[in-house]
């Protein structure tokens, strides 16, 4: 137990200056570049490697696939062997395989390297939030999750522009950036101070304990909320919003990218302020507010007739997203005991990937029946469902 004086000292310190958290920021900024940094190069890759537009999407698919299969397994290993023993080799694999892509001119070999890079990326997202859960608690936990989410949003907003600029020099230049994972890996190895769990229970007992925890009603509701959030995010927003902007308003890819970057920037600013917001509102109230804002933003989008008016739902959606994701992650982290937290967070990360996969498919079906506007109203409806679920947390 921490003494009262220690708690006061921790409350007064600026948590974002903590070396451990800054290293976690570095890991976050590294693994999210796996997709966003290369997508602006896709048109050039299609042309230079003489492949179809359909095939170029495999560069994302083969990168993402290992995460679905390996994330829970690597979470179990991290609980038993330690976080750093998984993160360090994962960063090495991510950086080296990613860097080798820079030198490859054969598409099949490029896919193999992307698959290997995806294996390296698989545990990084869930283990960063696991370590935050290990290091911080209560209001500090919310603040740390908020800062990490803010960093992730800033990276998501800036990487497409950086990748696009590099792709103007050559299609393969964006692939060199993941090499930064190598020095980040050594920072983790020598400078990251994290409590490593002493887990001596048999693997079967370990899995039984985790399974029992996952069956808790509150955790089940959090998992459902997580899936629905990512169905809405990757279906209604990530898939349908660009289609609306391009097909209905004739906006260029550059303008669409800048508009969508606005959400990430607003989310980044909002997340960075969660440490202050949590002093006035509970986590449940923050979640309720975020779902109301999600529903409002998605309901407004189909009604807009002038492109410049999109700044209204962009601001609303960005605020909602900046509030929501860090709080969801914090609730997951709090629900898991330290000995099983990596497994626990890995399962939650896998549910996010399920929502990410289902979102475009489900909203594609909605579009075929009710049109593009129906996809936004469906997303708003899902937000209301999540608002109701939060009452039962």
Region locations from a protein language model:
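Juxtamembrane intracellular "pre-TM" segments in multi-pass secondary transporters
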Residues: 5-16, 193-223
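Helix-breaking motifs and short loop linkers at transmembrane-helix boundaries and internal kinks
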Residues: 50, 82, 103-109, 120, ...
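Conserved MFS/SLC helix-loop-helix module at the cytosolic interface between two early adjacent transmembrane helices
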Residues: 69-108
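Helix-to-loop junctions at the C-terminal end of transmembrane segments
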Residues: 71-82, 270-282
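Cytoplasmic helix-loop-helix junction between adjacent transmembrane helices
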Residues: 113-152
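Helix-loop-helix hairpin linking two adjacent transmembrane segments in secondary transporters
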Residues: 147-190
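C-terminal membrane-cytosol helix-exit motif in multi-pass small-molecule transporters
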Residues: 179-198, 386-393
